[in-house]
Amino acid sequence: MKFEVRGAFKTLEGWQKFTKVVEANNERYALEKVYSLIGSNHKVKRNLIKIEEVKQA
C-alpha cells in the first residue's frame, strides 16, 4: 500500500514542511520509512521531525 505522510522538520532557518509518498505494509512502517529518509537526506534526528498526518494514498 502507499501512504502519504505530511509533516515538518527543523532546519537552521526554521521548520521545513514536507510531503512524502512511501510504499509500506502499514502506517507504522510508513512512519519508520519517512523518519529514515528525512534523517538520512537532511541529517535530522527523529525528535526534530514532526508528523502532522498519515493517510493512505
From Swiss-Prot:
Q: Which GO terms describe its cellular component?
A: ribonucleoprotein complex; ribosome
Q: Which SUPFAM superfamilies does the record match to this protein? A: RplX-like
Task: List the Pfam families.
Answer: Ribosomal_L18A
GO biological process assignments: translation
GO molecular-function terms, A-Z: large ribosomal subunit rRNA binding; structural constituent of ribosome
Keyword annotations for this protein, in alphabetical order, are:
Ribonucleoprotein, Ribosomal protein, RNA-binding, rRNA-binding
Q: Does the keyword RNA-binding apply?
A: yes
Description of how the protein assembles with itself and partners: Part of the 50S ribosomal subunit. Binds 23S rRNA.
Task: Identify the NCBIfam families for this entry.
Answer: PRK00773.1-1
Family, according to the entry, reads as follows: Belongs to the eukaryotic ribosomal protein eL20 family.
Q: By what name is this protein known?
A: Large ribosomal subunit protein eL20
Organism listed in the record: Archaeoglobus fulgidus (strain ATCC 49558 / DSM 4304 / JCM 9628 / NBRC 100126 / VC-16)
The gene name on file is: rpl18a
